[in-house]
């Protein structure tokens, strides 16, 4: 029997997108063939490529992020190009990543009479708040309301967002979070110490990791100012964005601010495991904050590291429930300093780290995500899938493993 083909639609070039990669590899592990139509707006990647078994076909259409309402014209042309390629492709399920691929995937699925999966990585209309005309945002909400009532499966990243879609009429919705493979965050003490020493962090120093987009809403300046008065605290800061100049200047002034530039996937785990604390900053006033369940949360849980975060979204709920970090009342320099001072206490930090690791191993890890995908795709493709082998839970000393 030929393997069932899942056609994924994506509006980035897949370099690779971490969430899309995890889901694609899981489906391949279940015996599916995964084909991916991706938009390369920078015209830099290969037109056809196979990465880890994922068959990628890129659609070239030059554009830029952040165009606002004028991006609609580029989407119209993109849809025509993708529709032509998609209809020439044999597939058994169409899997639409985010709202900007859903209308196209919905049309393809209906024309070919195949199941349609909507994978909502976030609340897309909320993400666009302030960057497109209000009428466009309202239209997107109405469009999404129409489509979520008619797709076969809605997957999203957290329970709060899943309930939000359910209240708006989604027929069948499940959570597959941005959960991490525990094995990818497994490090020995020696490996972690090697990373720390390579960065010039003393064994006795308190290392905070913050790998993110360097944007104004990520509360980076508050962290940088907070550590100035804490001589034992070091910050491993990675990413690209509009604040790169500010971060570079801060690192030049303060040798305890270690700017490592853009960080590829594997190195995120290296730095997270080598650190003592994970910092996540985001503007609570952003409409998407109420649903926030970011990668940083699951990276910290997989590595067994306490978190410092703001009081919003699913991330705050998890940190409180698991007792695995500190939820800031507000993002102010003084509040960040208080949190760091608390976590300088080895006993408190070790207890929170153990809680993070336990919660990650038992509740929010990629083994659980693969199980959900298998269950849901088995109902879409009866009798066609192999059960995933999964990951065995790792010993506490092995996951993340350095000083706490």
What would you call each of these model-derived segments?
Residues 7, 202-228:
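Conserved donor-binding/catalytic core segment of Leloir-type glycosyltransferases
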Residues 80-88, 103, 107-111, 124, ...:
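Membrane-proximal helix-turn-helix segments that form the acceptor-binding/catalytic region
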Residues 245-270:
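Nucleotide-activated donor-binding/catalytic signature segment of Leloir-type glycosyltransferases, i.e.
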Residues 277-280, 299-309:
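Short hydrophobic beta-strand element within catalytic cores of glycosyltransferases
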Residues 348-363:
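A short, well-ordered alpha-helix in the C-terminal region of glycosyltransferases
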Residues 47-49, 135-138, 186-201, 390:
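A short helix/loop element that forms part of the nucleotide-sugar donor recognition site in Leloir-type
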Residues 321-322, 326-333, 341-347:
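Conserved acidic donor-binding segment of nucleotide-sugar-dependent glycosyltransferases
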Residues 160, 179:
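Carbohydrate-associated surface elements
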